[in-house]
């Protein structure tokens, strides 16, 4: 479909898909709750509430269960761009673009001496961006977006040494540094990259098990030294202690806030990579020839499994935890699909290629331009939680500069309402037992509420809540 000299059309297609995934909603409202919470903590840091090692917000005294690096990086964007609701989307969009660049560089590093394959760097980038998990994560401000930048950088640094056998100390230090940065972004799930040297023994004739063992030792030792140096800082050590107690122990124990079957990650992984498996089955049906790089294909698939299967240790099973592991998966599947690209180039006549390529080229350009227009015409619209966000806009108008609103106890677990109100309007929802003076009160629609003060007047009837003004 793409001639050897026409790879630019593939890059245009990738740009068009990226534009379609993220530009129309770049300035829209609505996000998965984890992304909102992370944005609240970053916003609080920007407002000088809490610190790097002591994250908290107006509504949360401390948030020890969240590693701080991505929060800190996002807070820098608030300092640069201002406290706007779209800043976290811009940050995630830039992470997505950087991630595409890193996948491109990973492929170039892997096939540095194979010019024909190196030119197909668009293929893993295309697989990455058409993966539904990718579009969802970068559209919802997930911490995995930042973490994946660091784990991919660590993979590149490790492969660079395996390819050249030069600068083993520098390469080991870089791998360790990137993994430490990934660790303080999301936690220990990043450590799967340490498996890479063992999996790539024999990648070339000079990289034997002795050198792999030495390289692994230097990586782990460097990581240990860097981690000990960092967490010997009292504030960092205090954070790590609380993180272990509030995040690691519950997730490894018998209960956690997001309990699920320990093996559900296998189903989630199957769902995530199913499109690639289907494409691989088509490729196998068309061309059963043995891959020249078959061992490389299996190495990357095993590395992807190293990043996925250990999640079974935890009670917490979420599909977006798989994002860092998807990088080796897309590289592996791209290697397997290379013969399919060659087959398409052979079977599709040059005359047809000359017709198809302009369609892709100009269709992609048109898509990008359309998405740029939608980026602004869709600004301020809702992409999820429409009724709730619409109600909260009215609440903000009616409560003006009020920073707290009292509510029935039933609202205690209305996390989306509380988090949206805090993130978008800096207003905190307080329960009836809190000693907070505020002239406003939430109840469920068409209900008087358990603790609504006598004489209160309903000033807004919404779809998700009613707002009362209480007597002063």
Residue ranges of predicted features:
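Extracytosolic helix-loop segments that constitute the early lumenal/periplasmic catalytic or substrate-binding loops
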Residues: 20, 38-62, 69-72
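Loop-to-helix entry region of an early transmembrane alpha helix in multi-pass inner-membrane enzymes
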Residues: 68, 72, 81-98, 140-141
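Transmembrane-helix motifs of polytopic, lipid-linked glycan transferases
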Residues: 90-114, 153
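Membrane-interface transmembrane helices that cradle and orient dolichyl/undecaprenyl
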Residues: 108-118, 154-172, 337
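Short acidic/glycine- and proline-prone juxtamembrane loop motifs at membrane-interface regions
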Residues: 133-147
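Transmembrane-lumen/periplasm boundary regions of multi-pass, lipid-linked membrane glycan transferases
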Residues: 178-181, 185, 190-293, 308-315
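Hydrophobic/aromatic-rich transmembrane helices and adjacent perimembrane loops
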Residues: 316-352
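Short periplasmic/luminal acceptor-recognition loop of GT-C membrane glycosyltransferases, typified by
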Residues: 373-471
């Amino acid at each position: 479909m793409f001639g050897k000299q026409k790879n630019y059309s593939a890059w245009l297609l990738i740009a068009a898909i990226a534009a379609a995934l993220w530009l129309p909603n770049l300035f829209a409202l609505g996000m998965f709750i984890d992304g909102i919470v992370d944005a609240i903590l970053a916003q609080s840091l920007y407002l000088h509430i809490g610190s790097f090692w002591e994250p908290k917000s107006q509504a949360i005294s401390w948030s020890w269960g969240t590693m701080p690096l991505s929060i800190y990086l996002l807070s820098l964007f608030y300092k640069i761009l201002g406290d706007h609701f779209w800043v976290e989307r811009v940050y995630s969009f830039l992470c997505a673009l950087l991630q595409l660049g890193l996948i491109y560089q990973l492929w170039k590093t892997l096939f540095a001496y194979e010019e024909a394959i190196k030119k197909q760097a668009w293929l893993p980038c295309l697989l990455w961006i058409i993966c539904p998990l990718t579009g969802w994560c970068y559209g919802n401000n997930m911490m995995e977006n930042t973490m994946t930048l660091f784990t991919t950088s660590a993979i590149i640094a490790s492969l660079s040494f395996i390819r050249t056998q030069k600068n083993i100390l520098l390469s080991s230090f870089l791998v360790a540094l990137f993994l430490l940065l990934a660790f303080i972004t999301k936690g220990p799930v990043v450590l799967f990259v340490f498996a890479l040297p063992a999996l790539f023994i024999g990648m070339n004739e000079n990289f034997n098990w002795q050198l792999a063992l030495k390289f692994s030792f230097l990586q782990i030792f460097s990581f240990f030294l860097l981690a000990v140096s960092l967490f010997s800082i009292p504030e960092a050590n205090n954070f790590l202690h609380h993180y272990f107690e509030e995040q690691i122990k519950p997730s490894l124990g018998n209960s956690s806030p997001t309990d699920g079957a320990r093996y559900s990650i296998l189903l989630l992984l199957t769902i995530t990579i199913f499109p690639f498996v289907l494409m691989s089955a088509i490729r196998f049906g068309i061309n059963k020839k043995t891959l020249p790089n078959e061992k490389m294909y299996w190495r990357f698939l095993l590395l992807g499994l190293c990043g996925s299967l250990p999640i079974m240790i935890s009670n917490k099973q979420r599909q977006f935890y798989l994002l860092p592991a998807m990088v080796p998966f897309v590289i592996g599947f791209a290697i397997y699909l290379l013969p399919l690209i060659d087959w398409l180039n052979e079977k599709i006549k040059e005359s047809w290629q000359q017709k198809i390529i302009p369609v892709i080229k100009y269709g992609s350009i048109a898509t990008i331009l359309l998405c740029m227009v939608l980026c602004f015409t869709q600004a301020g619209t809702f992409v999820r939680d429409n009724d709730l966000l619409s109600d909260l806009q009215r609440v903000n108008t009616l409560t003006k500069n009020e920073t707290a609103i009292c509510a029935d106890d039933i609202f205690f677990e209305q996390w989306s309402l509380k988090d949206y109100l805090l993130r978008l309007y800096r207003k905190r929802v307080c329960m009836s037992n809190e000693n907070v003076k505020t002239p406003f009160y939430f109840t469920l629609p068409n209900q008087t509420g358990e603790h609504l003060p006598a004489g209160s007047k309903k000033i807004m009837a919404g779809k998700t809540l009613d707002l009362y003004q209480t007597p002063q």
